[in-house]
């Protein structure tokens, strides 16, 4: 996750050019700290499978949850790590959605070598099947996600039916809060940028956890030599 200096992680977009993540990151893709953040993201995708919420999927049409997206520089060492760990070349791309109202033309569902999987409700699974006709729907795990215990059952099925043991959840904040509320969130890797977002200029502003109030412990923190105003934090919620 990335957050501004004042803890903002998202807001309701006004249009396609109003990109919260880009604004929080400062816009300059060549900044050394921005490159470090990207490398960390790619590394974390090596340890298991990767998940996002439906909102993140809709807002990022070019997203593929891979250690090497089509626009990334080659990094064969990342795939070599997965091979040594006995993992498939690409992580499963898991999307959480209550409604199943997902754009099936998205890259996650159309990129060769990517195995998509949707965690949803029964209604959501039915909606996915309708949208996919006459083709096949993506694989789904359907549970009553709004019911206490629904997310727990979904996670148990991800392991039992699909072998999902370690899950790198890239947000957004709504999904992280749901996983935390279900006591499923172990750690958060947070990149805190030096940029301050004017909250009065946006609607439906989302904020990162108050980690101390949520019972998390800061177990690691670092920066970059090029710009120490960027902070890379690792917060632990659970000792599992």
Predicted regions and their residues:
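Enzymes that bind and transform nitrogen-containing heteroaromatic metabolites
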Residues: 1-240
């Amino acid at each position: 996750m990335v957050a501004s200096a004042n803890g903002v992680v998202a807001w309701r977009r006004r249009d396609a050019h109003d990109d919260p993540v880009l604004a929080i990151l400062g816009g300059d893709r060549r900044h050394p700290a921005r490159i470090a953040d990207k490398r960390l993201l790619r590394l974390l995708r090596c340890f298991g499978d990767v998940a996002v919420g439906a909102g993140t999927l809709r807002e990022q049409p070019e997203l593929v949850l891979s250690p090497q997206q089509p626009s990334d520089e080659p990094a064969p060492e990342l795939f070599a790590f997965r091979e040594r760990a006995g993992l498939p070349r690409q992580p499963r791309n898991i999307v959480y959605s209550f409604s199943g109202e997902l754009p099936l033309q998205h890259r996650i569902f159309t990129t060769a070598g990517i195995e998509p999987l949707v965690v949803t409700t029964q209604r959501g699974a039915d909606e996915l099947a309708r949208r996919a006709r006459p083709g096949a729907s993506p694989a789904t795990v359907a549970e009553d996600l709004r019911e206490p215990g629904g997310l727990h059952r979904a996670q148990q099925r991800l392991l039992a039916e699909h072998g999902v043991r370690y899950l790198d959840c890239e947000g957004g904040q709504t999904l992280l809060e749901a996983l935390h509320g279900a006591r499923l969130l172990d750690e958060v890797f947070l990149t805190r940028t030096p940029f301050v977002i004017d909250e009065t200029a946006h609607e439906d502003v989302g904020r990162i956890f108050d980690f101390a109030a949520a019972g998390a412990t800061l177990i690691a923190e670092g920066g970059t030599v090029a710009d120490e105003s960027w902070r890379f934090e690792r917060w632990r919620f659970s000792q599992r």
